[in-house]
Amino acid sequence: MVTPHGILLLTITAAASLLWITFAEITIPNDAKSFENFLKEHGPGKPGPLGYFNSIYMAFTREEAENFPNLVSVHTRMKRIKTQNSTIPDKYVILGIQAPNDTQEQNSTRNKRDSESYTATTQSGTCSTTIGGLQRLCEVCPARTDLGPDITPRFINEVLCDVPGLDCGVGQVGGKCRSASVFQDFLRFSSSDSNLEVYSQEIRVCCECALALS
């Protein structure tokens, strides 16, 4: 005869076993190839503006993140990409990226998924008013962001405004310094069922002077 205590013990044991199986069946991508394969199978089917994975902007481990290039001080091998909230058609960023064929369509799809807020961002180098040999209207700073252990890739390489919202402009045309971003498909553990899910992660790639046109 099974007592109520025995039934409770069996229930807890079964639940623990199911939880173990759930985690055991999850293979967390920890390299570029497995990450790309996971996104191709479970994601929207299209690479982001930086490709599926880009080691210049993304890293799985802290050791990899420590080898991020300084996006402000690197002046060579530049290429154009579209940014999500830019008032300028193109922004210059470091080579190694893939320009999207249909940015508006991709951004519309990605914005339907929640964007993860920044967890811990630290400045990783000296700020500058020049990038790519060009004089900037806003001072830009290299930074590294740790998104936390539930996110993969965990680390991102970014470019930030030294003083967000600082006045800038040309002649009589004024503006404000603000970050421009791209959105990439990343993975995180779902809080509801402990499964990996695809979500849209913002990566700040430049600081621009947004002019107030009137």
Swiss-Prot record:
The region annotated as signal peptide is 1-24
Compartment(s): Secreted
State any GO CC term.
extracellular region
State the residue spans of region: Disordered: 99-121
Location (main, coarse): secreted
Origin species: Acropora millepora
Q: Lineage of the source organism?
A: Eukaryota, Metazoa, Cnidaria, Anthozoa, Hexacorallia
Q: What is this protein's name?
A: Uncharacterized skeletal organic matrix protein 8
* Expression across tissues: Component of the acid-insoluble and acid-soluble organic matrix of the aragonitic skeleton (at protein level).
Keyword DNA damage: yes or no?
Answer: no
Give UniProt keywords alphabetically. Secreted, Signal
Compositionally biased tracts (Polar residues): 100-109
